[in-house]
Amino acid sequence: EPSEAMIETMYEAIPYDSYDRVIAVGGGAIMDLCKLLGCKRPTSVHELYFKREPVVHEKEVIAIPTTCGTGSEVTNISVAIVKDEKDGKLTGGDTKLGLVSDDIIPNKVCLVPDLLKTLPYKPFAASAIDALIHATESFLSPHRKTVTSEMFSVKAMEMILEGFRRIALEGPDARMDYLGEFVHASLFAGIAFLKAGCATVHGMSFPLGGTYHVPHGESNYALFGKILEMYDEYEPAGELGKFKEIVARCLGCTKEDALRTLNVTLEKVLHLK
């Protein structure tokens, strides 16, 4: 995860007047760092993340993702672990915060599926599950969901679930013929949660990343199944009912068995410790 100290070091190493544009090639952390390089330099990273300094886009950012999970190439958020504070005073601990502003959305995106060929399987699987969670949470959003976000979230879920179905049946190498779909699905999920936001899974996973430095995709995955079960106990119909219909259609099961089948499939894709 990017950290406050890492960002400060980056600012010191790369003078602001030494470049005209930023080309971000990497995973979500690289995207988040490079999105900041496209903005006016703050006097303090800490003040920036605690929203006491404005975010001002000034330089072109071209995003080229090498993972298929964060969707950071199309989102308006940059996440970092920063020094925590309470009532304006440092606590001595760290916290994970998202800097949200449309000024940090990259100007252009270039998707190159072949870049995923050398991505090790575990980070591939964790990032793809993260993309599925982005799509799911934006689809289930009760207040912010729009026609546009639903279109992108449904397509992302369908593409990712089909890829996971293949991996569950044929093994990890099955992903190699489906990398284009995975990288596009990640972008679609990013657009969906740019519009509709994320929810409980991401809200609860942030402390795991900030305090224990658990990788983002893995911390989300650890919470995903149980939170869906809680949703199902609280309100099994409505948007969750529609979500279960999508899962059932994609994974070839009944609507009643959708959440269990999803958990079984995800366990085959990536063992949850």
Show where each model-derived region lies.
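Gly/Pro-rich interdomain helix-loop hinge
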Residues: 211-273
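C-terminal and late-domain segments of enzyme folds
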Residues: 121-188
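N-terminal small/polar loop signature for handling phosphorylated ligands or for N-terminal nucleophile
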Residues: 1-47, 52-53, 166-178
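A glycine/threonine-rich phosphate-anchoring loop and its flanking beta-alpha core
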Residues: 40-145, 238, 242
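Acidic, glycine-rich active-site loops and adjacent beta-strand->loop/helix elements
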Residues: 1-2, 29, 37-40, 66-69, ...
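Glycine-rich phosphate/pyrophosphate-binding beta-alpha loops
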Residues: 69, 187-220
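Short glycine-rich or small-residue beta-strand-to-loop segments that form or flank ligand, phosphate
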Residues: 21-25, 62, 189-190
